[in-house]
Curated annotation (Swiss-Prot):
It is a multi-pass membrane protein. One of its GO terms (molecular function) is G protein-coupled receptor activity. Expressed in squamous epithelia. Residues 1-19 form the signal peptide. This is Adhesion G protein-coupled receptor F4. It comes from Mus musculus (Mouse).
């Protein structure tokens, strides 16, 4: 079956008033089992040196109980020790499979290591081995890891371990060449593992995990796993745990309308919450004719966990609710209608739906609007609008998702593409008049190839943005697009390097000139040969392990293989060389005459400024700001400056490299005058008496 998933929307409904905290009547047996399992493996921190009074700005590390690995970190707050990080874990690769195979001691090759920061002083746990163990012992249903997870204490360290476990399972399905679809047994047991760390006892422990993105990682991992789920019947309830529920339904283009209802039990409410997902008829008709499916995953407590870990939204006017719905929708479906039961029906409260943005760790109101808010139900219309990938991703070690950056990128690239096309048209018009000498010929060859490389790179960058929401399903296409982007952006830089070398050649060599054919050969070898070698080596080395592209965008990988260095290092090295060339030009331009007047000095300053302004976009000096975006946690303003300067580079090339060149302007005027002269001559010929007599003689 062809890949059909194009979008995952994470939506949450919340009220303006706090809800009651009474326990539910439903799932009472499951709740009792949950409490019993916790009592079996009670976690009791040791009494030790991190007790009593303390001095401000001090910290204290305390070892975990004897049957746990890791440590507990305390910091002093108002003269009292306060727990900040806890990495105590009892889970490991061996303990997961001990019940299935007591003598199991997995020593399989692994590409994913559990971060040291999450387990304190324990040895690194090769989480990648877990998936290989699953493939060995229980590939059909994943049941072999469920008991070990459910019997473990819900410590912060174990929560982090389980999140990494679920994340690894999901990513291995996508990237390890194992493309089997997820059946209902796998989804059910995967849900049981996730359910263990979503209970009310676990909520407060999420705050002490070193990785503050763990809750968001869990949400994305479950979504990624649910993407592979194949629904067999018309409507199926797959996972029905206390803290996670999954339901799927088949949908088709021919349906008049479609709805999917889900009754979600609430741990802190007396009644279940009924959620109805409707797909409008018009949205269904826009789908492809092949039958598809929609999947909803409900997390009754994940909203509370996200609130516990992430900072509150200052822009939202209402307190957030705990229920989160993840919707896995087919390709082309951009609109849905959500109907929720209000939790507290006795109060008159206003409500709204929002979407979770994992990049910013914030809720976003823009995708959803409230259609009705009457009595006990709320109805919202939610649309999925895919934004263009931010231009700052080209140098960034971590993609920055921001509306301002997206707008700058979209507007800048549109203007740049138009400007570069216009630049090439002008070059074609004036070519015969401006390429008089070898140096002028090579100068315009450089400008044309710089424009062609940047134009092609920008077009492929936009195409790559359209794959960013579905990178895993379109992996081969994403690799191809990334390779072309990589090659043409490198070609841009190497042609700018060759132009800088031509400038140095013109300054240093006055009387002796190189043959045009030799200069052309050197130019194309540098401009296209070097980038091709770098791009081919990069994809050859990294792609066998599927580490060439990012997991969330069609661009060079950073986290696993550092393939981004294959672009950043050559680009920044060329920028450094070109900066030295600009300084050399500035020094060469400022030769003052003896006894020169103040006006002559000002003319020199103006000439230097003009040369620097012209050479800056043509030699790519604006890309020097990319050095700041390579650093994690850098302020958004640097990304904005980088996007502004480089998204508009095509416009700057047209302005400073073409329009401000007086020879090109003169050639254009001559061309226009020549065309006007020809048109006048044609008019005179058509209106001449001789021509008129010939017409009459016919």
């Amino acid at each position: 079956m062809k890949p059909w998933i194009a979008m995952v929307c994470c939506l949450v409904f919340f009220l303006t008033t706090e809800c009651s905290h009474s326990k539910p009547k439903t799932h009472r047996k499951d709740e009792d089992k949950f409490q019993i399992s916790l009592q079996k493996h009670e976690f009791r921190p040791r009494q030790g040196k991190c007790d009593g009074l303390c001095s401000s700005s001090s910290s204290c590390n305390q070892s975990c109980p004897w049957n746990f690995r890791g440590e507990i970190v305390f910091t002093c707050n108002q003269n009292k020790w306060q727990k900040t990080i806890e990495t105590c874990t009892s889970l490991s690769v061996d303990t997961l499979f001990q019940r299935i195979h007591p003598a199991a001691s997995l020593s399989l090759a692994s590409s994913s290591v559990f971060p040291m920061s999450l387990i304190g002083n324990a040895a690194p746990v090769h989480i990648g081995n877990v998936f290989q163990g699953i493939q060995k012992y229980c590939p059909e249903d994943y049941v072999c890891i469920v008991d070990a997870v459910k019997s473990s204490a819900v410590t912060s360290g174990n929560i982090a371990f389980i999140v990494e476990l679920l994340k690894n399972i999901s990513s291995n399905l996508q990237t390890s060449g194992i493309h089997d679809n997820v059946n209902w047994k796998k989804m059910k047991n995967y849900g049981k593992v996730a359910n263990h760390i979503l209970g009310p006892t676990a909520i407060s422990n999420w705050a002490f995990i070193a990785n503050k993105n763990a809750s968001s990682d869990l949400l994305e991992s479950v979504n990624s796993f649910a993407k592979k789920l194949q629904i067999q019947g018309k409507s199926e309830s797959i996972v029905d745990e206390l803290f996670i529920q999954t339901k799927g339904s088949r949908i088709s283009h021919s349906s008049s309308e479609h709805s999917l209802s889900l009754s979600v039990p609430r741990y802190n409410a007396t009644e279940d919450v009924l959620v109805v997902i409707e797909i409008p008829r018009q949205a269904l008709q826009e789908l492809s004719f092949n039958a598809s499916q929609a999947i909803v995953v409900a997390f009754p407590t994940l909203g509370a966990i996200l609130k516990e870990v992430h900072r509150p939204n200052t822009s939202l006017q209402k307190p957030i609710d705990d229920l989160i719905l993840s919707l896995v929708l087919p390709e082309g479906l951009n609109e849905i209608i959500l109907t929720f039961d209000k939790i507290n029906k006795s109060q008159s409260t206003s409500s709204q739906c929002v979407s979770w943005d994992p990049a910013t760790g914030q809720w976003d109101e823009s995708p959803c609007t409230v259609m009705s808010d009457i009595n006990s139900t709320v109805k919202c219309r939610c649309r999925h609008t895919k934004a263009v990938t931010s231009f700052s991703i080209l140098m960034s070690s971590k993609p920055v998702k921001n509306t301002i950056l997206n707008h700058i990128t979209f507007i800048g690239l549109s203007i740049s593409i138009f400007s570069l096309v216009l630049c090439l048209v002008i070059e074609a018009i004036v070519w015969s008049r401006v390429v008089v000498t070898e140096i002028s010929y090579m100068r315009h060859v450089c400008i044309v190839n710089i424009a062609v490389s940047l134009l092609t790179a920008n077009v492929w960058f936009i195409i790559g943005s359209n794959f960013s929401a579905n990178v895993q399903e379109d992996h081969k296409w994403c690799v191809a697009v990334t390779f072309l982007c990589h090659f043409f952006f490198l070609s841009l830089f190497f042609w700018m390097l060759f132009k800088a070398l031509l400038i140095v050649y013109g300054i240093l060599v006055v009387f002796r000139r190189m043959m045009k054919s030799r200069m052309m050969a050197i130019g194309f070898a540098i401009g296209y040969g070097c980038p091709l070698v770098i791009a081919v080596i990069t994809v050859t080395v990294t792609e066998p392990g599927e580490g060439y592209t990012r997991k969330d965008a069609c661009w060079l990988n950073w986290n696993q293989t550092k393939a981004l260095f294959a672009f950043a290092i050559p680009a920044l090295a060329i920028v450094a060389v070109n900066l030295l060339v600009v300084l050399a030009v500035a020094i060469n331009t400022q030769r003052p005459l003896i006894g020169s007047s103040k006006s002559q000095d000002m003319a020199i300053v103006f000439r230097i400024s003009k040369n620097v302004a012209i050479l800056t976009p043509l030699l790519g000096l604006t890309w020097g700001f990319g050095l700041t975006t390579l650093l994690e946690g850098v302020h958004l303003v640097f990304h904005i400056i980088f996007a502004l300067l480089n998204a508009f580079q095509g416009f700057f090339i047209l302005l400073f490299g073409t329009i401000m060149d007086h020879k090109i302007r003169d050639a254009l005027r001559m061309r226009v005058s020549s065309l006007k002269g020809k048109s006048r001559a044609a008019e005179k010929v058509s209106l001449s008496p001789a021509n008129g007599s010939r017409i009459l003689n016919r």
